[in-house]
């Protein structure tokens, strides 16, 4: 494309030049480079008739460039204007898809669903398969965010089928990200791994494909409570972030993943340094869900530093930011982290109430992985004790939680991350467990629990 632009003469052949510029627009979109996209779109619009296919497509995608470049309000205004000019036909599908994409990233979730569903429906009216795939991929993310996970999975299946018959692979990682995340949260590790393989099989160098593939892998690792692995997977995103939509609050939910993993991996100074610029940018944009996600990571950090009052403020501010938004998964996530932090600070009764709230949401979502983690937290808190087997006689709730996880094969470090305590504390409990149960090793404990 670089050579094509170098040899075309815009003055003598503006139509061809507009077509080349339009190809650069699409290239910039999947490189997640907003400023470049806007620049090429403006060139295309300057060369093409505003009502020509190249002109309309450039205008329809230009708003996505504004969004990725840090101008979400301008992007929304651009689509409002464009939707009044392009109301019918295949080109209208591009406009409504782009509008839904922007609406979702900007927390306008209900309108995003309406727009994206309209774009999908337009497929039967002569719409583009490529645009339909983008709409399906982002619609699946909408369904995930609001807790409609069965519909999200169904939407992914629809996208998979269309990708297979069309041969268009660019949206496959975006589709498989949703599939992998839901499968991991539901404890279907085989399906999660299969989704990641499907994404990896088509992922090349384009950021729009690399980013969701890495997010899928990282969110599986987080569901496994392997925070060191989560951090390692997410680190490449930090390296590729400058100049891309990764820097935009709410676009890709990776900063809270990284910050949370840093805190739970004991890298507190690194977590603070990482959070600050993302918090500043989210405040500047006024992005509620991004601030809420960063806020729960900040709350984790305050808790790890022993400042429970600051931690409480951060978590409560996050929940307030989410109030009125239909983001059920994010709400459960904040409550779970809040409850863990309260329990670590010795606020068992308060922790019990908050974790119970998280558990109710996770249960309604079918997020069995986190329901089980909530149950372990509640058991460790000691306020909801249940009768165990004769092998467990004499174990405290915290010892029982440690014994269960160790018997499953987790290392002390992994148990510590799961229960939000230090590895030294895990070893202390493990020594007591061995003495009480009359075993001498992890393998003997596992055998006793079979």
Cite the ranges covered by each PLM segment.
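Helix-turn-helix DNA-binding segment
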Residues: 313, 337, 379, 385-440, ...
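Internal alpha-solenoid helical repeat scaffolds
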Residues: 1-174, 182, 291
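Amphipathic alpha-helical segments of tetratricopeptide repeats
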Residues: 2-10, 42-49, 79-87, 117-128, ...
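Linker/hinge segments immediately adjacent to helix-turn-helix/homeobox DNA-binding domains
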Residues: 304, 308-314, 340-398, 413, ...
């Amino acid at each position: 494309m670089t050579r094509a632009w170098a040899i075309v003469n815009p003055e003598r052949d503006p139509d061809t030049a507009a077509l080349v510029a339009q190809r650069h627009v699409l290239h910039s979109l999947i490189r997640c480079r907003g400023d470049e996209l806007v620049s090429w779109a403006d060139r295309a619009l300057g060369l093409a008739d505003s009502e020509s296919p190249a002109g309309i497509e450039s205008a329809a995608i230009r708003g996505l460039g504004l969004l990725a470049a840090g101008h979400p309000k301008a992007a929304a205004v651009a689509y409002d204007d464009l939707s009044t000019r392009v109301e019918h036909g295949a080109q209208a599908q591009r406009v409504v898809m782009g509008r839904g994409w922007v609406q979702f990233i900007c927390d306008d979730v209900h309108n995003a669903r309406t727009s994206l569903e309209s774009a999908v429906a337009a497929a039967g009216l002569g719409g583009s398969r490529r645009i339909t795939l983008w709409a399906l991929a982002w619609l699946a993310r909408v369904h995930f965010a609001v807790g409609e996970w069965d519909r999200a999975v169904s939407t992914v299946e629809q996208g998979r089928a269309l990708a297979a018959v069309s041969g268009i692979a660019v949206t496959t990682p975006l589709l498989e990200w949703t599939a992998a995340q839901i499968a991991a949260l539901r404890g279907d590790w085989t399906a999660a791994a299969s989704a990641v393989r499907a994404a990896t099989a088509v992922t090349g160098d384009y950021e729009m494909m690399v980013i969701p593939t890495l997010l899928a892998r990282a969110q599986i690792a987080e569901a496994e409570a392997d925070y060191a692995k989560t951090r390692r997977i997410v680190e490449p995103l930090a390296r590729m972030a400058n100049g891309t939509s990764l820097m935009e609050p709410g676009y890709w939910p990776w900063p809270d993943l990284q910050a949370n993993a840093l805190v739970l991996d004991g890298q507190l100074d690194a977590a603070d340094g990482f959070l600050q610029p993302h918090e500043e940018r989210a405040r500047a944009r006024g992005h509620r869900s991004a601030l809420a996600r960063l806020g729960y990571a900040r709350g984790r950090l305050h808790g790890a530093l022993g400042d429970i009052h600051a931690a409480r403020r951060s978590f409560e501010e996050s929940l307030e930011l989410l109030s009125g938004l239909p983001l059920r998964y994010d709400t459960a996530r904040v409550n779970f982290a809040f409850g863990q932090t309260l329990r670590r600070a010795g606020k068992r009764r308060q922790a019990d109430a908050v974790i119970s709230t998280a558990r109710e949401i996770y249960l309604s979502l079918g997020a069995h992985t986190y329901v089980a983690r909530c149950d372990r937290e509640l058991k460790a808190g000691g306020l909801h004790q249940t009768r165990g087997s004769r092998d467990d006689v004499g174990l405290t709730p915290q010892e029982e939680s440690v014994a269960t996880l160790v018997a499953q094969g987790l290392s002390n470090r992994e148990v510590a991350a799961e229960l939000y305590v230090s590895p030294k504390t895990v070893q202390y409990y493990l020594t007591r467990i061995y003495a009480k149960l009359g075993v001498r090793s992890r393998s003997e404990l596992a055998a006793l629990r079979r």
